[in-house]
Amino acid sequence: MAVKKRAGAKKKEKKVIPVGKAYVQATFNNTIVTLTDLQGNVIAWASCGTAGFKGSRKGTPYAAQMAAQTAARKAAESGLRQVEVLVKGPGSGREAAIRSLQASGINVTAIRDVTPIPHNGCRPPKRRRV
Protein backbone atom coordinates (compact mmCIF):
# COMPACT_ATOMS: atom_id res chain seq x y z
CA MET A 1 0.00 0.00 0.00
CA ALA A 2 1.48 3.28 -1.13
CA VAL A 3 1.11 6.24 1.18
CA LYS A 4 -0.29 9.31 -0.56
CA LYS A 5 1.19 12.71 0.15
CA ARG A 6 -1.32 15.32 1.13
CA ALA A 7 -1.90 17.83 -1.63
CA GLY A 8 -1.47 21.47 -0.74
CA ALA A 9 0.39 20.89 2.53
CA LYS A 10 3.34 23.25 2.45
CA LYS A 11 5.91 23.83 5.15
CA LYS A 12 5.45 27.17 6.89
CA GLU A 13 8.20 29.58 5.87
CA LYS A 14 9.99 31.44 8.64
CA LYS A 15 10.27 35.14 7.91
CA VAL A 16 13.48 36.87 8.94
CA ILE A 17 12.55 39.85 11.12
CA PRO A 18 15.63 41.77 12.35
CA VAL A 19 13.87 44.62 14.24
CA GLY A 20 10.91 44.38 16.61
CA LYS A 21 9.38 45.20 19.98
CA ALA A 22 9.51 43.34 23.29
CA TYR A 23 6.53 43.71 25.62
CA VAL A 24 7.13 42.80 29.27
CA GLN A 25 3.96 42.60 31.36
CA ALA A 26 5.03 42.20 34.99
CA THR A 27 2.26 41.63 37.53
CA PHE A 28 2.76 40.64 41.15
CA ASN A 29 1.90 37.02 40.32
CA ASN A 30 3.43 36.45 36.87
CA THR A 31 5.52 37.96 34.07
CA ILE A 32 4.69 37.63 30.37
CA VAL A 33 7.27 38.46 27.69
CA THR A 34 6.06 38.92 24.09
CA LEU A 35 8.34 39.65 21.14
CA THR A 36 6.68 41.14 18.05
CA ASP A 37 7.60 42.74 14.75
CA LEU A 38 7.07 46.49 14.31
CA GLN A 39 3.45 45.97 13.20
CA GLY A 40 2.63 44.02 16.37
CA ASN A 41 2.50 40.50 14.91
CA VAL A 42 3.72 38.05 17.56
CA ILE A 43 7.02 36.28 16.80
CA ALA A 44 7.53 34.56 20.17
CA TRP A 45 6.18 34.72 23.70
CA ALA A 46 6.81 33.11 27.07
CA SER A 47 5.58 33.45 30.62
CA CYS A 48 6.84 32.24 33.96
CA GLY A 49 4.28 29.44 33.79
CA THR A 50 5.54 28.20 30.41
CA ALA A 51 9.10 28.39 31.78
CA GLY A 52 8.11 25.73 34.33
CA PHE A 53 7.25 27.73 37.44
CA LYS A 54 4.06 27.24 39.45
CA GLY A 55 2.22 29.20 42.10
CA SER A 56 3.96 31.99 43.98
CA ARG A 57 7.32 31.21 42.30
CA LYS A 58 5.96 32.76 39.08
CA GLY A 59 6.20 36.20 40.68
CA THR A 60 9.95 36.01 41.28
CA PRO A 61 12.62 37.87 39.29
CA TYR A 62 14.39 34.58 38.48
CA ALA A 63 11.22 33.20 36.87
CA ALA A 64 10.93 36.39 34.77
CA GLN A 65 14.56 36.00 33.74
CA MET A 66 13.96 32.42 32.55
CA ALA A 67 10.77 33.44 30.69
CA ALA A 68 12.58 36.26 28.87
CA GLN A 69 15.43 33.90 28.00
CA THR A 70 12.98 31.36 26.52
CA ALA A 71 11.18 34.02 24.45
CA ALA A 72 14.49 35.48 23.23
CA ARG A 73 15.74 32.06 22.15
CA LYS A 74 12.55 31.45 20.11
CA ALA A 75 12.74 34.92 18.53
CA ALA A 76 16.43 34.56 17.66
CA GLU A 77 15.48 31.61 15.44
CA SER A 78 13.31 34.04 13.45
CA GLY A 79 16.28 36.38 13.09
CA LEU A 80 15.28 39.02 15.65
CA ARG A 81 18.35 41.08 16.55
CA GLN A 82 17.14 44.47 17.79
CA VAL A 83 14.17 45.38 20.02
CA GLU A 84 12.54 48.28 21.77
CA VAL A 85 11.31 47.17 25.21
CA LEU A 86 7.92 48.31 26.53
CA VAL A 87 7.39 47.50 30.21
CA LYS A 88 3.97 47.40 31.85
CA GLY A 89 3.05 46.67 35.45
CA PRO A 90 4.46 46.87 38.97
CA GLY A 91 5.90 43.34 39.25
CA SER A 92 9.30 42.27 40.51
CA GLY A 93 10.28 40.74 37.16
CA ARG A 94 10.60 43.99 35.21
CA GLU A 95 14.35 44.60 35.47
CA ALA A 96 15.24 40.91 35.44
CA ALA A 97 13.39 40.36 32.15
CA ILE A 98 15.12 43.34 30.48
CA ARG A 99 18.56 42.21 31.70
CA SER A 100 17.88 38.71 30.44
CA LEU A 101 16.88 40.00 26.98
CA GLN A 102 20.13 41.98 26.77
CA ALA A 103 22.21 39.01 27.94
CA SER A 104 20.67 36.70 25.34
CA GLY A 105 22.28 38.67 22.52
CA ILE A 106 19.35 40.86 21.48
CA ASN A 107 20.26 44.54 21.12
CA VAL A 108 17.94 46.72 23.25
CA THR A 109 17.57 50.16 21.65
CA ALA A 110 15.09 51.77 24.05
CA ILE A 111 13.18 50.98 27.25
CA ARG A 112 9.77 52.58 27.76
CA ASP A 113 7.42 52.29 30.74
CA VAL A 114 3.85 52.06 29.48
CA THR A 115 2.20 51.20 32.82
CA PRO A 116 -1.36 52.54 32.79
CA ILE A 117 -1.88 55.10 35.57
CA PRO A 118 -5.50 55.86 36.50
CA HIS A 119 -6.72 59.43 36.85
CA ASN A 120 -8.59 58.21 39.94
CA GLY A 121 -10.54 55.52 38.11
CA CYS A 122 -11.52 52.25 39.78
CA ARG A 123 -11.42 51.79 43.53
CA PRO A 124 -8.32 49.78 44.52
CA PRO A 125 -8.66 46.51 46.45
CA LYS A 126 -8.78 46.76 50.24
CA ARG A 127 -5.55 46.49 52.25
CA ARG A 128 -4.40 43.00 53.25
CA ARG A 129 -4.39 42.29 56.97
CA VAL A 130 -2.03 39.40 57.70
UniProtKB/Swiss-Prot annotation:
GO biological process: translation
Protein keywords: Ribonucleoprotein, Ribosomal protein, RNA-binding, rRNA-binding
GO cellular component, one term: ribosome
Keyword RNA-binding in record: yes
Keyword field contains rRNA-binding: yes
Coiled-coil region(s): none
GO terms of molecular function: rRNA binding; structural constituent of ribosome
PANTHER family according to UniProt: 40S RIBOSOMAL PROTEIN S14/30S RIBOSOMAL PROTEIN S11
Role noted for this protein: Located on the platform of the 30S subunit, it bridges several disparate RNA helices of the 16S rRNA. Forms part of the Shine-Dalgarno cleft in the 70S ribosome.
Quaternary structure and partners: Part of the 30S ribosomal subunit. Interacts with proteins S7 and S18. Binds to IF-3.
NCBIfam families (alphabetical): PRK05309.1, uS11_bact
Family statement drawn from the similarity comment of this UniProt entry: Belongs to the universal ribosomal protein uS11 family.
Name of the protein this chain belongs to: Small ribosomal subunit protein uS11
